[in-house]
Amino acid sequence: SGSCSLKTCWMQLSPFREVGNRLKQKYDQAAAVRLARRRRLEPVNQRFSPPTKMDLVYLETSPDYCMRNDTTGAAGTAGRQCERGSAGTGGCELMCCGRGYDSFRATSTERCHCKF
């Protein structure tokens, strides 16, 4: 009698946090390019090497989200509340775009409808 063995291979995605970190790294290193002859991409800054298939590139710069833009409907960031200690997108350093910010302390009293 014969015997047979079965092998199964599968591919699996990396953990979500790792994928996000890699994508953020690519975003931070993205290079501006323009369309050259024969539909080839070349870097806008000639000091850089031509992009590879693994590089993230862009043709147009992003709008300035700090400033109000009625054409695109962007409200800008002036007047918004920020988180003073945060290093993230909601943090004052990033959200206030170098304009500075006012700090204030607020106390709120609300009924909690607690039952004991």
From Swiss-Prot:
SMART domains: WNT1. Disulfide bonds join 82-97. A lipid is attached at residue 1 (O-palmitoleoyl serine). Palmitoleoylation is required for efficient binding to frizzled receptors. Depalmitoleoylation leads to Wnt signaling pathway inhibition. Glycans are attached at residue 69. One of its GO terms (molecular function) is frizzled binding. Keywords: Developmental protein, Disulfide bond, Extracellular matrix, Glycoprotein, Lipoprotein, Secreted, Wnt signaling pathway. Signal peptide: none annotated. Pfam families: wnt. InterPro entries: Wnt, Wnt_C. GO terms for biological process: canonical Wnt signaling pathway; cell fate commitment; neuron differentiation. It is found in: Secreted, Extracellular space, Extracellular matrix. It comes from the Eukaryota. One of its GO terms (cellular component) is extracellular space. Ligand for members of the frizzled family of seven transmembrane receptors. Probable developmental protein. May be a signaling molecule which affects the development of discrete regions of tissues. Is likely to signal over only few cell diameters. Belongs to the Wnt family. This is Protein Wnt-5(I). It comes from Eptatretus stoutii. The gene is WNT-5(I).
